[in-house]
């Protein structure tokens, strides 16, 4: 078996585990309401059903409970989330970037929160690096879960350096990686990659974002 074949097989195992363990999103609107106080843009993980995915749903639910009576619009990034990692993430970046910039243009007083899980974290990384610098002033917080950053993830990417969060966003980002998660560490526990809701990390990230919304300029 060649190394490329091995990477492909293990990648399918990871994606299948995500699809089986992660609950599909339900009932969440795909597009943010015009000029809500807060706009959340979230990208789901590989092979999760269209919508926010379970991590995104839990993050938004927790954030909603922490921001008082402020209105929250939610946008689920529209992209394949397929195992054609590089092309799929690039497609997601295009969709996320376009939506974020439309929000900034139409609703300049809306505070934006970005989030992504697994491949979705790469989508947000690519988006923040591609958008005009002025957009960063409208983004209050970024929450990343299981961001692909391991050697294994690099192989799935096709080699070379993996995307990282844009420099203008790094100080407003919480980047959470479960212990032994093979996607964001050198670990070997695939189940760790689907533990972000149960571990309480989505609530941790929501608290970070809520504090940023309350205190950041």
UniProtKB/Swiss-Prot annotation:
GO terms, biological process: lipid catabolic process; medium-chain fatty acid catabolic process; monoacylglycerol catabolic process; short-chain fatty acid catabolic process
Catalytic activity reported: a fatty acid ester + H2O = an aliphatic alcohol + a fatty acid + H(+); a butanoate ester + H2O = an aliphatic alcohol + butanoate + H(+); pentanoate ester + H2O = pentanoate + an aliphatic alcohol + H(+); a hexanoate ester + H2O = an aliphatic alcohol + hexanoate + H(+)
Residues of the active site: 118, 181, 193
Pfam families, per the entry: Cutinase
Disulfide bond annotation, renumbered to this chain: 35-107, 177-184
Residues under site feature: Transition state stabilizer: 119
InterPro entries: AB_hydrolase_fold (IPR029058), Cutinase/axe (IPR000675), CUTINASE_1 (IPR043580), CUTINASE_2 (IPR043579)
Record has Signal as a keyword: yes
GO function term, MF aspect, one: short-chain carboxylesterase activity
Family statement: Belongs to the cutinase family.
Functional description taken from the UniProt entry: Shows esterase activity, with a preference for short- and medium-chain fatty acids. Also has weak lipase activity, but does not exhibit cutinase activity. Hydrolyzes various p-nitrophenol-linked aliphatic esters, including pNP-butyrate (C4), pNP-valerate (C5), pNP-hexanoate (C6), pNP-octanoate (C8) and pNP-decanoate (C10). Can use pNP-laurate (C12) and pNP-myristate (C14), with lower efficiency. Can also hydrolyze monocaprylin and triolein, with a slow turnover.
Name of the protein this chain belongs to: Carboxylesterase Culp1
Organism of provenance: Mycobacterium tuberculosis (strain ATCC 25618 / H37Rv)
